[in-house]
Amino acid sequence: MRVGIPTETKNNEFRVAITPAGVAELTRRGHEVLIQAGAGEGSAITDADFKAAGAQLVGTADQVWADADLLLKVKEPIAAEYGRLRHGQILFTFLHLAASRACTDALLDSGTTSIAYETVQTADGALPLLAPMSEVAGRLAAQVGAYHLMRTQGGRGVLMGGVPGVEPADVVVIGAGTAGYNAARIANGMGATVTVLDINIDKLRQLDAEFCGRIHTRYSSAYELEGAVKRADLVIGAVLVPGAKAPKLVSNSLVAHMKPGAVLVDIAIDQGGCFEGSRPTTYDHPTFAVHDTLFYCVANMPASVPKTSTYALTNATMPYVLELADHGWRAACRSNPALAKGLSTHEGALLSERVATDLGVPFTEPASVLA
């Protein structure tokens, strides 16, 4: 099979969908690997590195898209790439379709077979391809939140850990999943007072046990959420419903009652965001004001640390890439139910029930295309 990797096109997206180790394994198995020249530069992987591993360097993205049977990306296609989507090609990448009707329509119109990293799900409910980027985004959320709390950045002028005799920042994390856990862990390590809210008592119990009560936990009722947000210097939204739009848990009217200069970091922005006022931003212009607070809603946070993120992501994706390349998408999905959970579109059919519900598009059972 011909496996293609173009350069990422999203704003300040420095990750790449494969490493030289992945290239070497694919070519060892007899597959061709086509990589757009310069695709790895943002992750400090040179063309020479890829070529030495067995890749063929291609001059343009158009050629990669046109020649590849299996196309690997990190982020969803942007509008400039919609014309490259085509029938008969497998696209394996993050998609986040519930938050993008335009991308969904482009995939359906093209007939592309697409598989979303973020909805590949094992029998125990784990999301093995989303997890490493959630770890990175959660850890970054505490860092960027601390940075934007500085008065010079428009924040309250609060130091996360305080100093002797002066109280630390009050950090609230909404969601105790992978991203929320990692955000809370870093914020706690920085010395902040951290409260995590979730509706999953087992996750709260795990946090309480691991951190011996140093991280406060609350069941996420409307009452507890409102009180915590009003007290917070920094709120980190880390809510996830796999494949679906994130619920809007923090209203603009609640934001209006927050402390002036408080910062809100929305990790859930890829899925539409969990704050009412959220809208996607970029690293060029990462923040905007809502009432007297500062919103940070960069949709590709892990892109800022590509030397970490590229390797963390590809460590997780490569076993699935090898299955797709070795057996084709249909056989791979038949033999691996976790991969089948990631099926999103095929020949104009939408195969994700949650995306179909959120966007009001007819749903097709994946089993019907796997038969």
Curated annotation (Swiss-Prot):
Temperature notes for this entry: Relatively stable, it loses only 25% of its total activity after 4 hours at 60 degrees Celsius. The enzyme is much more active at temperatures above 37 degrees Celsius, particularly in the reductive amination. The velocity almost doubles at temperatures between 60-65 degrees Celsius compared with 37 degrees Celsius. Above 65 degrees Celsius there is a sharp decrease in activity, due to thermal inactivation of the enzyme.
Biological process annotations from GO: alanine catabolic process; L-alanine catabolic process; response to hypoxia
Pathway: Amino-acid degradation; L-alanine degradation via dehydrogenase pathway; NH(3) and pyruvate from L-alanine: step 1/1
Principal location class: secreted
Residue numbers binding Mg(2+): 323, 327
Cofactors that this protein relies on: Mg(2+)
SUPFAM superfamilies: Formate/glycerate dehydrogenase catalytic domain-like, NAD(P)-binding Rossmann-fold domains
Domain of life: Bacteria
pH dependence: Optimum pH is between 10 and 11 for the oxidative deamination and between 7 and 7.5 for the reductive amination.
Catalytic activity: L-alanine + NAD(+) + H2O = pyruvate + NH4(+) + NADH + H(+)
Cofactor: binding comment: Binds 1 Mg(2+) ion per subunit.
InterPro entries the UniProt entry points to: Ala_DH (IPR008141), Ala_DH/PNT_CS2 (IPR008143), AlaDH/PNT_CS1 (IPR008142), AlaDH/PNT_N (IPR007886), AlaDH/PNT_NAD(H)-bd (IPR007698), NAD(P)-bd_dom_sf (IPR036291)
Cellular component annotations (GO), alphabetically ordered: cytosol; extracellular region; peptidoglycan-based cell wall; plasma membrane
Compartments, as annotated in UniProt: Secreted
Binding site for NAD(+): 134, 178-179, 198, 203, 220, 239-240, 267-270, 279, 298-301
SMART domains: AlaDh_PNT_C, AlaDh_PNT_N
Activation/inhibition comment: Inhibited by CuSO(4) and ZnCl(2).
Function: Catalyzes the reversible reductive amination of pyruvate to L-alanine. However, since the physiological environment of M.tuberculosis has a neutral pH, it can be assumed that the enzyme catalyzes exclusively the formation of L-alanine. May play a role in cell wall synthesis as L-alanine is an important constituent of the peptidoglycan layer.
PANTHER family to which the protein is assigned, alphabetical: ALANINE DEHYDROGENASE
Name of the featured protein: Alanine dehydrogenase
Lineage: Bacteria, Bacillati, Actinomycetota, Actinomycetes, Mycobacteriales
